[in-house]
A protein has these predicted regions:
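General beta-strand structural signal in soluble alpha/beta enzymes
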Residues: 112-116
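Generic structural signal for well-ordered beta-strand positions
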Residues: 32, 87, 157-158
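Active-site glycine-centered loops adjacent to acidic/histidine catalytic or metal-binding residues
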Residues: 117, 143, 312
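A charged helix-plus-loop insertion that forms the helical arch/lid used to bind
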Residues: 85-96
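Short glycine-rich anion-binding loops that position phosphate/pyrophosphate groups of nucleotides
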Residues: 77-80, 143-145, 268
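Glycine-rich phosphate-binding loop of actin/hexokinase-like ATP-binding domains
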Residues: 132-190
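ATP-binding/phosphotransfer module of carbohydrate and carboxylate kinases, centering on a glycine-rich
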Residues: 1-71, 81-83, 102, 106-110, ...
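Short hydrophobic alpha-helix segments
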Residues: 35-37, 90, 160
């Protein structure tokens, strides 16, 4: 056994709707080996856990063996760190409460921790990204949903049940759009993918002006942002409304938390100035005046394909080491 490498590696796992990626990561955040498989290939949780555990074992055995790996950290949507579970995910085929930490721990013989993907992103940004050295910041992930995390006093805030920081499900419009969570008027219903597309359709309905959006068979935030670059007035108006609503929601959030920065991640952030300029204006118009001008808007500078894995590796270092053997 090489004593220089004992327990100086962890496994980071990123579970998304499309793919499950896993990697061996060292203490400096270097990804040493990586593999993946399509998440959708395993609609039954037992088969999924088998595929993931088998993949992790093969990766470990091909890269130094079990004696070098301390633990496993997992990033997943709808995950609850306190429960070690994915809870009532609206998008995965696995329904109810899935005790993923326990299922994998029993198969791998390693300590396993699972956390919400936004919480994991915050850990990664603090350790390796643009939040390094900060004690108080917010992470916002914009994509198919709106994920968020409060990082304050040097750590992720979980709340009593592990659901703290869910700004996506705060109300920005009384009796507004129905959200996937079942409530009405949630910020997510206006700023995530489906909400942006709905706003685009509303803009087109309200005006008879010509727009290339009318000729697009399948609208997406990326297509709309591309049309913004071409000067399409309705596309620009779509992101103006989206940004304005986002900025209002963030102003409420920041007025309570008093963060040093808000860090943005996710595919929708590629809209750039078309989203962020109206968001920043609305934020400045509504945030508590004592912190106006002090909260930085930052975009994550970590590699998008590695961000969640790196955050999951930080989570893995935090979990107590597990062994199948009882020490005397």
């Amino acid at each position: 056994m090489n004593e220089g490498t004992v327990k100086k590696r962890v496994v980071g796992v990123d579970i998304s709707l499309d793919a499950t990626s896993y990697a061996i990561v060292d203490v400096r955040g270097n990804i040493l080996a990586k593999d993946s498989f399509p998440t959708e290939d395993y609609p039954e949780i037992g088969a999924y856990v088998s595929a993931l555990s088998d993949g992790i074992v093969k990766l470990i055995e091909a890269n130094g063996g079990y004696e070098t790996v301390r633990s496993v950290g997992i990033s997943a949507p709808s995950a609850n760190y306190k429960l070690g579970s994915i809870v009532n995910s609206p998008n995965f085929p696995w329904k109810g409460v899935i005790p993923l930490s326990a299922l994998l721990r029993d198969r791998l013989g390693l300590a396993v921790a699972v956390a919400n993907n936004s919480h994991v992103v915050a850990l990664g940004e603090h350790a390796f990204g643009c939040a390094h050295g900060m004690r108080d910041f917010i992470v916002i992930t914009l994509g198919s949903g709106l994920g968020s995390c409060i990082f304050t006093d040097g750590g992720v805030k979980l709340g009593s049940d592990g659901y703290a920081g869910e700004i996506g499900h705060t109300c920005v419009h009384h009796d507004g759009r129905l959200c996937g969570c079942g409530n009405k008027g949630c910020l997510e219903a206006y700023t995530a993918t489906k909400g942006i597309i709905r706003t685009a359709r509303e803009v087109m309905t309200e005006s008879g002006e010509p727009s290339k959006m009318r000729r697009v068979e399948k609208l997406t935030p990326r297509v709309i942002s591309q049309l913004c670059e071409e000067g399409d007035a309705m596309a620009i108006e779509t992101f103006r409304r989206t940004g304005e609503t986002l900025g209002l929601g963030l102003a409420n959030y920041a007025s309570v938390i008093n963060p040093e920065a808000i860090i943005f991640t996710g595919g929708i952030i590629r809209a750039g100035k078309w989203l962020m300029e109206p968001a920043k204006k609305a934020f400045d118009d509504h945030v508590f005046h004592n912190i106006k001008g002090k909260v930085k808007f930052l975009t994550s500078d970590l590699d998008e394909s590695e961000r969640n894995i790196l955050g999951a590796s930080v989570l893995a270092w935090e979990v107590k080491e597990y062994s199948l053997f009882i020490e005397s």
